[in-house]
Amino acid sequence: MLDIKQIRQQPDWFKEKLATRGVQPEEIDTVLELDAKRRELLQQTETLKAKRNEASKKIGEAKRAKQSADEAIAEMRQVGEDIKALDEQVEANDKDLFDKLAHLPNVPHEGVPVSLTEDGAEELRKVGQARQFDFEPKHHWEIGENLGILDFERAGKVSGSRFVYYVGLGAQLERALYNFMLDEHMKEGYTEVLPPYIVNAHAMYGTGQFPKFKQDVYQVNGEDMTLIPTAEVPLTNYFAGEVIPAEKLPVYVTALTPSFRSEAGSAGRDTRGLIRMHQFNKVEMVKYTKQDQSWEELDKMTANAENILQKLGLPYHVITLTTSDMSFTASETHDLELWMPAQNKYREVSSCSNCLDFQARRLHMQYRDENGKLQYVHTLNGSGLAVGRTLAAILENYQNEDGSVTIPEVLVPYFHGITKITKENAVPFNNK
């Protein structure tokens, strides 16, 4: 949520900055009109309350003088009705103002590439060399299906498209990956959390998924509850409505959860494989910081995500997303994209974002600065990493010509000595 006081003070600046995110100037004008109307209605209410107090005083004086107070009583009754009518107008106006503010995205940070499309992202660095194959590399779904460790067909019978069974060493690889990710993050000072997977609408509003992106999630019929689209939601809401002791900041938390997404608007995109699923595992990182810490912490969070890829030996690059491509709540986002040899392109595996006080303002999360003044915390979130996409990249980058897949060295301890996934060991029940 943006600060209405700041919008009131710098309307042209907000129009200019938010125009880079597709916001029309008229949307800011509407917010300002509703804000002006609100202040006018509140002033009228205060005037009437003063009038009511004066009428009450007249009634008291008349009664003490044993005179008729009928006129003052009638006046007070009328003023009361007028105040009630104004209160209803204030409530309706506040609802409109709140709704309009809730649809405005965060202001992009200085230096974020300006574009109304995803084109124009700035590459910050490229790490690792793409493997040169002496055979035609297969897509991850082909490798997984041939080995029997990814079963899209049976998942389709049970759940429909964009679902998968991980089987045998496929399930073990998924588990090894998220355990490795969590272990690495905890070494960097993150506290592991196992959060709820179903949250209420207020939690979804707090992190910015609601009201604008309701069509992208799965909601429980007849209840004000939603399956989480990312662990960012329950993790960021952990301190909602609280004043966090300043000496605790920054706070780092991490969690593995399933993520549930309807993928509305994705028809025809990535219809095969693990890239775009309705349900997928993801390890999330969330930080709460003081206001002067968040940009340094964004760099650290991005490095935490990169650490996983570097230890897995996967080539990737880091880009800064454009003003219109980053998430609704973000002021700046760094994406990590993995090299997928069969697709011959990079695919996103992590987004690390600084949301400044945008989410904290919605969730009323604060701390006291050195002067004892309440300040909103800054929140950051990042994938560390999307597990299925990382697994897909391992299958493609570590594939062998005979169809087997070499297990990255750092994951071998999770496999109790197995170093390669083959047709013979991939799915034990297939060998009976």
Swiss-Prot record:
ATP binds at R261, S262, E263, E348, V349, S350, S351. PROSITE patterns: AA_TRNA_LIGASE_II (PS50862). Disulfide bonds: none annotated. GO terms for biological process: selenocysteine biosynthetic process; seryl-tRNA aminoacylation. InterPro entries: aa-tRNA-synt_IIb, aa-tRNA-synth_II, aa-tRNA-synth_II/BPL/LPL, Ser-tRNA-ligase_type_1, Ser-tRNA-synth_1_N, SerRS_1_N_sf, SerRS_core, tRNA-bd_arm. It is found in: Cytoplasm. Pfam families: Seryl_tRNA_N (PF02403), tRNA-synt_2b (PF00587). Pathway: Aminoacyl-tRNA biosynthesis; selenocysteinyl-tRNA(Sec) biosynthesis; L-seryl-tRNA(Sec) from L-serine and tRNA(Sec): step 1/1. Its EC number is 6.1.1.11. Keywords: Aminoacyl-tRNA synthetase, ATP-binding, Cytoplasm, Ligase, Nucleotide-binding, Protein biosynthesis. It catalyses: tRNA(Ser) + L-serine + ATP = L-seryl-tRNA(Ser) + AMP + diphosphate + H(+); tRNA(Sec) + L-serine + ATP = L-seryl-tRNA(Sec) + AMP + diphosphate + H(+). One of its GO terms (cellular component) is cytoplasm. It comes from the Bacteria. GO terms for molecular function: ATP binding; catalytic activity, acting on a protein; serine-tRNA ligase activity; transferase activity. Consists of two distinct domains, a catalytic core and a N-terminal extension that is involved in tRNA binding. Homodimer. The tRNA molecule binds across the dimer. Catalyzes the attachment of serine to tRNA(Ser). Is also able to aminoacylate tRNA(Sec) with serine, to form the misacylated tRNA L-seryl-tRNA(Sec), which will be further converted into selenocysteinyl-tRNA(Sec). Belongs to the class-II aminoacyl-tRNA synthetase family. Type-1 seryl-tRNA synthetase subfamily. This is Serine--tRNA ligase. It comes from Limosilactobacillus fermentum (strain NBRC 3956 / LMG 18251) (Lactobacillus fermentum). The lineage of its organism: Bacteria, Bacillati, Bacillota, Bacilli, Lactobacillales.
